[in-house]
């Protein structure tokens, strides 16, 4: 059987065109690479190389062999990746969260339901979550849209709306509701990791200056000791967890209210059924 490394050498030589450059990339000597190419030629039993003084080239068959080698190496890499992903899935559940509130609510639940498993989570925009479920980067995801493809199994798990938290002296504090355009141009406190909300803020309030904070404690301290507006979530407001001395005004744009969905591959819905049974459309409220 042909050594995979010899196929890598053939592919690299075909890409480089010279022994010296290929040897440098492969971190080997030219004589060693020449011997290896000769062994490969002997293995397949056909002439792959043209030889002249101080030059080694590829025959048409050699060029075709190099193309096949590249394909085989790609398949080998895919094989290794899939095996590693599968092995990791036996011990680790990777989940993508599209916003902070679902992560806060579901993480303790997931740890309870899948006790003994390692939980690995990301919190970012969900525009590629379905792709990451397909390629098994994630086993679970929480999105702010419901997938329509039968490839995915999903369930609504709640709702969140955004408010703007203002000091009593802010002119907007006298309004029963506001729109994003009312906030455009203001200086606003904002957490750094807020998933898909981040893109929405940038697009809908392009003239606002955001004072980005890494930690919730920093937001709380600044909200307590400054007059900067700060976004608040209906989830925390409904639980009485508000910024002291501030008035929470609802932001009524459609973009500021969303439903959340727990998603997995349909082929794995039985595996994650215990979690899906634990959640409902009021889990996040």
Outline where the language-model segments fall.
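Alpha-helical linker/hinge and terminal dimerization helices associated
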Residues: 7, 43-44, 65-94
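Central regulatory/effector-binding core of bacterial HTH transcription factors
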Residues: 89-148
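Flexible hinge/capping segments at coil-to-helix
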Residues: 154-162, 166-188
């Amino acid at each position: 059987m042909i050594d995979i490394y010899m196929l890598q050498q053939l592919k690299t030589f075909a890409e480089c065109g010279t022994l010296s450059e290929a040897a440098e990339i492969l971190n080997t000597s030219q004589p060693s690479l020449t011997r290896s190419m000769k062994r490969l030629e002997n293995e397949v039993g056909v002439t792959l190389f043209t030889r002249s003084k101080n030059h080694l080239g590829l025959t048409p068959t050699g060029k075709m062999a190099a193309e096949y080698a590249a394909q085989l190496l790609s398949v080998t890499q895919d094989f290794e990746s899939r095996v590693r992903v599968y092995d990791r899935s036996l011990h680790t559940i990777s989940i993508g969260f599209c916003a902070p509130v679902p992560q806060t609510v579901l993480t303790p639940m997931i740890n309870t339901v899948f006790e003994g498993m390692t939980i690995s989570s990301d919190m970012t925009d969900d525009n590629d979550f379905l792709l990451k479920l397909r390629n098994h980067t994630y086993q679970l995801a929480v999105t702010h849209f419901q997938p329509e493809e039968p490839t995915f199994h999903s369930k609504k798990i709640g709702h969140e709306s955004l408010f703007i938290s203002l000091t009593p002296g802010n002119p907007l504090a006298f309004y029963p509701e506001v729109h994003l355009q009312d906030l455009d141009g203001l200086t606003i406190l904002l957490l750094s990791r807020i998933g898909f909300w981040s893109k929405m803020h940038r697009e809908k309030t392009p003239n606002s200056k955001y004072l980005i904070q890494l930690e919730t404690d920093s937001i709380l301290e600044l909200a307590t000791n400054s007059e900067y507006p700060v976004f608040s979530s209906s989830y925390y407001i409904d639980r009485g967890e508000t910024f002291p001395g501030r008035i929470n005004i609802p932001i009524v744009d459609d973009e500021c209210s969303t439903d959340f969905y727990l998603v997995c591959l349909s082929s794995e819905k039985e595996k994650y059924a215990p979690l899906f049974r634990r959640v409902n459309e009021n889990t996040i409220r």
